[in-house]
Amino acid sequence: MNAIKETRFELPGQTGFYKGKVRDVYYVADKLVVVASDRISAFDVVLPRAIPFKGQVLNQIAAKMLAQTADVVPNWILSVPDPSVSIGIKCEPFKVEMVIRGYLAGHAAREYKAGKRTLCGVALPEELKENDKLPAPIITPTTKADEGHDEDISREDLLARGIVSEADYIQLEKYTQALFQRGTELAEKQGLILVDTKYEFGKVGDKIYLIDEIHTPDSSRYFYIDGYAERQAKGEAQKQLSKEFVRQWLIENGFQGKEGQNVPVMTDEIVSSISERYIELYEKVIGESFKKPEESNPEERILKNILKAL
């Protein structure tokens, strides 16, 4: 199976094109046609080899999760004409990512270990251990940097800097809490804990929409419910479902995206094992078996399905 490294379509009515780290975005009238390529990024670097089926895994998880939360928050999706494509409403994105955390993990745990007891203006209790459940989920927004890394920001700073209006931010907070609640319920049905995740929103006129992907292993962290309490009691690492395994492989091979470091050689075996892990993620998060497309030329299939949908 060929991986989808990139697409370069000329679509009827196309007014623009944007190549993201892993997505190819086509602007067609008031719509976005988003192709989830098989490119993979870690440490803000796109790795040299694409991972077969990765784009399909993320696109299909996001599409299913958007469908399962559409009663909670209106979202951008209009159709999913191909396993690797979503077509939706073109929104003006807010320049903030709404990160919500139910547990002390990842970035929050690193900050806590360094002695910080407030994160984005939110006070954290003493005596927490890494991966402990927080008393209640906390929202820790980050600014969306046009270049470079995103930055943590407090609600007060967001409003003071005029990044978002107070009325809109109140709505974003409500939507974020409601989505996390639904995401937590969906995860529990699959024997998983939704640890933390991020949501992005955009606006058309006065209406706010949920945009981009949600509850995927690239935008979220999941733990397994089974054995969680025992591992916490023993101080053991939690078994997690995310793309952390890719980062771990890179770190073990001397790469963390720092200057002067080279990306390690990705053998066919490594590419194949990452692909299998993504498929496993899909099946665990969604609870259905993954269907591989049979075509030898995925770009041809994708273009045909986009043209039919437009």
Swiss-Prot record:
GO terms for cellular component: cytoplasm. PANTHER family: PHOSPHORIBOSYLAMINOIMIDAZOLE-SUCCINOCARBOXAMIDE SYNTHASE. HAMAP family: SAICAR_synth. Belongs to the SAICAR synthetase family. SUPFAM superfamilies: SAICAR synthase-like. The keyword Transferase does not apply. It comes from the Bacteria. Its EC number is 6.3.2.6. InterPro entries: SAICAR_synt/ADE2_N (IPR028923), SAICAR_synthetase_CS (IPR018236). This is Phosphoribosylaminoimidazole-succinocarboxamide synthase. The gene is purC. The keyword Cytoplasm does not apply. Pathway: Purine metabolism; IMP biosynthesis via de novo pathway; 5-amino-1-(5-phospho-D-ribosyl)imidazole-4-carboxamide from 5-amino-1-(5-phospho-D-ribosyl)imidazole-4-carboxylate: step 1/2. One of its GO terms (molecular function) is phosphoribosylaminoimidazolesuccinocarboxamide synthase activity. Keywords: ATP-binding, Ligase, Nucleotide-binding, Purine biosynthesis. It catalyses: 5-amino-1-(5-phospho-D-ribosyl)imidazole-4-carboxylate + L-aspartate + ATP = (2S)-2-[5-amino-1-(5-phospho-beta-D-ribosyl)imidazole-4-carboxamido]succinate + ADP + phosphate + 2 H(+). GO terms for biological process: 'de novo' IMP biosynthetic process.
